[in-house]
């Protein structure tokens, strides 16, 4: 694996996504529409919206990043781009890391759109530093990008990618403390929740936005998410 080849792969991915209107719509349009619906649904329940906002942000960032990455990587594979690259001097490591670096800027932009819309338009109350929120989301994004790449290997078309959504996201939503606090779950569910990346994203955002904690207070959540991301990349 070389830096030049890796950057060449990531640069091609960036240019391809920039010229794809559907991808841009998924990055910017879809999160805004969904968050608008959420804000409208809780328009008369501001206290509830303030409490659930961190969990919603983490969930939507994971969901939309996973979807964007999975669909984009699948297109590369089904169109034969990956096969053509593998017969060149570009190695598998260059491809995987290059794709990761290519998707990351758009995923970060998407997370910033979600956070900005939530804070500025929906006007939720928050106590912590928003830059700490972004740092945590970058760690969660790393998991979502690599998870999307991994799952796309098993899909033959874009419809099958969407079929993986309940399998991938539903357990995380139920076991990350969004619906029921983890402490109130049966012990076996608590044990399973340990391997759910969304748990650490939700926990970290709640610490920052609801309690005003800093990045040093959630460094454990960030480290665990980075570990998940590295494991999926390998």
Segments from the language model and where they lie:
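Transmembrane helix-boundary elements of multi-pass transport/secretion proteins
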Residues: 2-83, 92-112, 117-133, 154, ...
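Hydrophobic alpha-helical transmembrane segments in multi-pass integral membrane proteins
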Residues: 176-181, 205-211
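Small-residue-enriched core segments of transmembrane alpha-helices in multipass membrane transport
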Residues: 53-62, 134-144, 166-174
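Transmembrane helix segments
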Residues: 37-45, 155-195, 199
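Transmembrane-helix boundary motif in ABC transporter permease subunits
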Residues: 144-157
